[in-house]
């Protein structure tokens, strides 16, 4: 029986990214290689954080986050075995904080998905915030 261990060189580390990978793919760790494999034998990698925090995310609703990421094609797609999934959404609107796991077929793809998701999420949040302020200003006239 192989158990996964995640080394977090910080306080408060979690196994959420590994558990998300397991739940999304029904894959497993291969004891011989140490790689996470899908049921069809494809290796998957992830990059994750439980502390994506930015002032631009404050006031954003979880449905807005999903819309922004889905419109950019960065949500997790089981057919492509790549994309981002989110947790800690209860902290999003009030604190501008969330957790995210980005999955790819190798380290480079997981990192590229992660970086693209952060970039698009922050840009989309800024655009939505600006549009909301414009609506408030128009309503006040």
Give the residues covered by each predicted segment.
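ATP-dependent carboxylate activation and anion-phosphoryl transfer catalytic cores
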Residues: 1-141
């Amino acid at each position: 029986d192989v158990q996964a261990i995640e080394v977090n060189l910080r306080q408060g580390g979690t196994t959420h990214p590994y558990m998300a990978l397991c739940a999304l793919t029904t894959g497993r760790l291969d004891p011989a290689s140490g790689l996470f494999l899908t049921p069809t034998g494809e290796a998957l990698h992830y990059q994750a954080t439980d502390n994506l925090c930015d002032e631009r995310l404050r006031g954003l609703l979880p449905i807005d986050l999903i819309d922004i990421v889905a419109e950019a094609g960065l949500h997790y797609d089981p057919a492509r075995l790549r994309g981002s999934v989110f947790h800690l959404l209860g902290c999003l609107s009030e604190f501008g904080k969330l957790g995210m796991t980005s999955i790819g077929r190798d380290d480079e793809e997981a990192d590229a998905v992660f970086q693209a998701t952060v970039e698009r999420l922050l840009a989309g949040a800024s655009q939505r915030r600006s549009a909301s302020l414009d609506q408030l200003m128009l309503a006040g006239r």
